[in-house]
Regions:
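Amphipathic alpha-helical hairpins
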Residues: 1-181
Length: 181
């Protein structure tokens, strides 16, 4: 059993391991999402960000080197929950704009988690005097924010398409916002 973190240095290392695991899971989830996406722009965004995420894993390995610790992950329960939710949603929704809208929403949930974690790690790295690590983490943070903005733009278009599909398909929405027969 690992000892509980007691210092900011310990918290930084434990969070870094958590994010390392999460980022590797993200690469797999993005590849799976790219295969599942029907909307071409969304598929391309997933493929591009999967490549970026692979580079981010390499960047995290550099951060481990900078702090003199082995690059190893620890199970990230948040990422496991987010990917499990994505899997469940993929099973629950049919193909088409609604499924793509759900994929985009799941991907954004991952991006928001990563933005929060990278922002924290970047700040802690600066406070701990790991300036080179802070620069690497800042670079990744900016990529995550850019990916989130792109997903937002794509999601707006997909959501409109999904709404149009609902209107054309003769389905209506109940007061709770869900489709009713």
């Amino acid at each position: 059993m690992a000892t509980k973190p007691k210092t900011l240095q310990d918290a930084f290392y434990e969070t870094l391991k958590d994010v390392y695991y999460a980022e590797r899971q993200s690469v797999r989830a993005l590849k799976k999402s790219a295969k599942a996406a029907e909307h071409e722009e969304l598929r391309q965004a997933f493929e591009t960000h999967a490549e970026e995420s692979a580079n981010q894993v390499e960047r995290l390995q550099q951060v481990f080197e900078i702090i003199g610790k082995p690059a190893r992950g620890k199970t990230c329960e948040a990422m496991q929950g987010l990917t499990a939710e994505m899997e469940e949603d993929l099973e629950d929704f049919e193909d088409g704009p609604a499924a793509d809208a759900v994929l985009a929403a799941c991907a954004q949930a991952v991006e928001h988690y990563e933005i929060a974690r990278y922002g924290t790690l970047k700040t802690w790295a600066s406070q701990l005097g790991y300036d080179d690590a802070a620069k690497l983490l800042y670079e990744t943070l900016q990529e995550e924010k850019k990916a989130d903005r792109l997903l937002s733009e794509i999601a707006e278009r997909i959501n409109v398409e999904g709404s149009d599909e609902d209107a054309e398909g003769g389905t209506t929405k109940s007061k709770g916002g869900r489709k009713a027969a």
